[in-house]
Amino acid sequence: MKHFTAAVATVALSLALAGCSFNIKTDSAPTTSPTTTSPTTSTTTTSATTSAQAAGPNYTIADYIRDNHIQETPVHHGDPGSPTIDLPVPDDWRLLPESSRAPYGGIVYTQPADPNDPPTIVAILSKLTGDIDPAKVLQFAPGELKNLPGFQGSGDGSAATLGGFSAWQLGGSYSKNGKLRTVAQKTVVIPSQGAVFVLQLNADALDDETMTLMDAANVIDEQTTITP
């Protein structure tokens, strides 16, 4: 088992099925067809910060940040003053470097059914300063997924933890480019040094690879450590 260690800031997410790991909803057990081809990563578009989330009818963390004049700073690996987060990299997955699609890096499955559309779990990390209520951050965490086109999920999700810190998780399905996809998000709040760091873990895969995503999410839930 490989690991990547990082100085963390704002958003964390996670997946779960029937109370375990990232809240992933499944209607039937999928059948996967692994290949040995190295995938060309095609992640769901992810905002570099929570305040850049797409608008929609459901109130989001981005709306809370805007309406309360909170300052948000993107956090990258090695930034001074940020917590240390150790996220596991499950077998048959590999690291994703930081990029516009993976602002704080992430992981990608190396044996996908479609090499051009592999399952991914992408991280975003932010530092919030100002008049912040961590409970409000978690309260509005479900809004981003619920604003996805055709999203169907398990209500508003459920309270959780990651590495000993409070979190909120939600999962379900939505449609993109005519294909049904599984999506899940875990948002973690990490109070540290007069600020609140938010870690978002965004998981996304074609519906047929839901179980692959869930297995990776279970590893993340069980083995992640966070040191403020």
From Swiss-Prot:
It is a lipid-anchor. It is found in: Cell membrane; Secreted. InterPro entries: Lipoprotein_LpqN/LpqT-like (IPR019674). The keyword Nucleotide-binding does not apply. Residues 1-19 form the signal peptide. PROSITE patterns: PROKAR_LIPOPROTEIN (PS51257). A lipid is attached at residue 20 (N-palmitoyl cysteine). GO terms for biological process: cell wall organization. A lipid is attached at residue 20 (S-diacylglycerol cysteine). Keywords: Cell membrane, Cell wall biogenesis/degradation, Lipoprotein, Membrane, Palmitate, Secreted, Signal, Virulence. GO terms for cellular component: extracellular region; peptidoglycan-based cell wall; plasma membrane. Residues 28-52 have a biased composition (Low complexity). Pfam families: Lpp-LpqN. Residues 26-53 are annotated as: Disordered. Disruption phenotype: Deletion mutant grows at a normal rate and has a normal cell envelope lipid profile, but shows altered lipid profiles during biofilm maturation. Mutant is attenuated in macrophages, but growth is restored when host CBL is removed. Involved in cell envelope biogenesis. May act as a membrane fusion protein, connecting MmpL transporters with periplasmic proteins, and play a role in cell envelope lipid changes during biofilm maturation. Interacts with the periplasmic loop domains of the mycolate transporters MmpL3 and MmpL11. Also interacts with secreted cell envelope biosynthetic enzymes such as Ag85A. These interactions are weak and may require a putative mycobacterial adapter protein or molecule. Interacts with human ubiquitin ligase CBL. This is Lipoprotein LpqN.
